[in-house]
Amino acid sequence: MAVEMFYDADADLSIIQGRKVAVIGYGSQGHAHSLSLRDSGVQVKVGLKEGSKSREKVTEQGLEVDTPAEVAKWADVIMLLAPDTAQAEIFTNDIEPNLEDGNALFFGHGLNIHFGLIKPPANVTIGMVAPKGPGHLVRRQFVDGKGVPCLIAIDQDPKGEGQALALSYAAAIGGARAGVIKTTFKEETETDLFGEQAVLCGGTEELVKTGFEVMVEAGYAPEMAYFEVLHELKLIVDLMYEGGIARMNYSVSDTAEFGGYLSGPRVIDADTKKRMQDILKDIQDGTFVKRLVANVEGGNKELEALRKKNAEHPIEVTGKKLRDLMSWVDRPITETA
């Protein structure tokens, strides 16, 4: 099924320019949205709790900052860009008491609306504007006169103006320069979670760790195993990112290409596909989100235990040692203390 696409010519920037926008959160996406909205002539304030370390940064970058409740009271369009697990509490405590008839509540990801963790009143427009790239890229492309493709979706539209408003917002952060794709909260949420769990984070991580274990258990040096299954992964992913799977296969050696065709289906087979389908089902029926909520309500104990177990894997020890030799690799704060 073909998607519906929109560009700058389809968007009316004056719509969002005539509104007051509160951006709650100033992380990767929050700073990109806020600065680009301002540069597009939109009235914008940032909502951060008292004592937030980001407040000084917001002020230094020339934006107004106040508490989430105060900016929600001031605005008629609220973009909630806090972490998924914090959004329901922010909505209940700070946003919902300040919503008025005709306000719009926007999100950068559909999880809380799609799974009913946030239940907004019927007289409020509920929409989503989700750039398909990290915040620093969204901002850099905007400054360069370009843009990152965006998704838009409308879940609730009491006044029939939701799509035009979302498209105007997307244009104000540069999305319509590249292309805006119309989707639904259901489609964005379920595809995003599946991609993260089965392929991008969960699937790739376990593939790398298992490959490392197989090589080390066969007697190969951990350093050699690390280079072959983790370090070189970036080279392959970059080729796929730039030109798809065909570009990657064209660029690697014939030996690598031929071996990949033969062995790839032995690693990822029909049984793997069935388990991936089971993961998708757990996402669709809410099983995953119930566990996510239980983890948060339990003080993140399950997440912390999983993090600890993962950090203790031998590939992490080997990787830290090898990255000390790589002056060109940006080092995370956890490795520079």
From Swiss-Prot:
GO terms for cellular component: cytosol. NADP(+) binds at residues 26-29, 49, 52, 54, 84-87, 135. The keyword Repressor does not apply. GO terms for biological process: isoleucine biosynthetic process; L-valine biosynthetic process. Pathway: Amino-acid biosynthesis; L-isoleucine biosynthesis; L-isoleucine from 2-oxobutanoate: step 2/4; Amino-acid biosynthesis; L-valine biosynthesis; L-valine from pyruvate: step 2/4. Substrate binds at residue 253. Its cofactor is Mg(2+). Keywords: Amino-acid biosynthesis, Branched-chain amino acid biosynthesis, Magnesium, Metal-binding, NADP, Oxidoreductase. Residues 184-329 form the KARI C-terminal knotted domain. It catalyses: (2R)-2,3-dihydroxy-3-methylbutanoate + NADP(+) = (2S)-2-acetolactate + NADPH + H(+); (2R,3R)-2,3-dihydroxy-3-methylpentanoate + NADP(+) = (S)-2-ethyl-2-hydroxy-3-oxobutanoate + NADPH + H(+). Binds 2 magnesium ions per subunit. It holds the Pfam family KARI_C. PROSITE patterns: KARI_C (PS51851), KARI_N (PS51850). NCBIfam families: ilvC, PRK05479.1. Belongs to the ketol-acid reductoisomerase family. Involved in the biosynthesis of branched-chain amino acids (BCAA). Catalyzes an alkyl-migration followed by a ketol-acid reduction of (S)-2-acetolactate (S2AL) to yield (R)-2,3-dihydroxy-isovalerate. In the isomerase reaction, S2AL is rearranged via a Mg-dependent methyl migration to produce 3-hydroxy-3-methyl-2-ketobutyrate (HMKB). In the reductase reaction, this 2-ketoacid undergoes a metal-dependent reduction by NADPH to yield (R)-2,3-dihydroxy-isovalerate. This is Ketol-acid reductoisomerase (NADP(+)). It comes from Mycolicibacterium vanbaalenii (strain DSM 7251 / JCM 13017 / BCRC 16820 / KCTC 9966 / NRRL B-24157 / PYR-1).
